[in-house]
Every structure is written in structure tokens, then in C-alpha cells.
Amino acid sequence: MRRRKFLSGSPNHIYQRSQNGSVIFYSLEDCLVYFTVFCTCAKRYGVTVLGLCEMYDHIHQLVEAPDLPTLSGFERMVNMTFSYEYYGDLKRGAEGFVSDRNITSGSVSVTIPNIGHLFQSPFGSAPKIGNKKIRTSIAYLYNNPVERNIHQEAIKWRWNFLAYAFS
């Protein structure tokens, strides 16, 4: 396995894809649970969050961690805790344990298989060195919903938290 690049004191662009390109966030609750787990783990691990964007099938983060073991531990805990909650919700269906669950969101009905890992492993990361690369990474992270044609305005996409960012 390749050694992960890391530079202490520099922001790292972290990207985490779903297994097989499947949807991660089906509901408002899924997004809020991930955000809660992410924020709780960031505080616990002493990770500074510069940006977060939850997409339907992947996640982008821009974070600063004091060292590589802290960053890896943080990502492991976020993914493990969210996966536990995600699959726990699937298993706590109306009939107890179910092998799959039909989730209805508005007029769209989707069946979620309850097999395997939720996220691809390992997570991807790229340290950002220098103001230009940091700014470019922030713009990429927050503009991802526009580039993927999910929303017309980045600031109005509720799951990139751009409306709550400050300079």
C-alpha cells in the first residue's frame, strides 16, 4: 500500500466515496447524523474543520490535524460510527432485522441493500500547501454541488455548510 502524504500544520483535502458508487445520504436524518458524528469526532480528536461537503454518494472535507495518526484515527472513527448508525437504522426496521429496507423520500422510493462496507477504503487525502492551493481546494469543495449539477448556487446547497462559513 502506498504511504499516505501528510504535512503537519497543512490542511488536507479528504475525500471518501461510497462503496460501488451507491447513495450514502437518503434523508435529512442521514445528513444530520453524519454532520453530528463528524463534529463530535473533530472535537474529540482536536481536528480543525475548514470545510465539509456532503454529496449523495461521497464526502469532501478540508481539515487540519496535528499528525497523521490523529487524522487516520479521526477518519476511522467518523466512518465507523456513521456506518454503525447507518446500518443500525437499516437493521431496526419495522420487522426487526431486515436484509433490505425501502426508504421513501418524497415521491422517490429506493431500496437499500444491507451488505458490505458503506465506504470505500482507504479514504483519499491530499495535503494542500500554500495559499493558492488552499483557496483552490476550498472553492472546489464548496462548489462541488454546482459542478455535479445538483444545485445552481453553492451557497444554497444545505450540505456544504457554506452559508455558515466565515472568513
Regions of interest found by a model, annotated:
Residues 1-167:
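Short catalytic/metal-binding and nucleic-acid-binding patches
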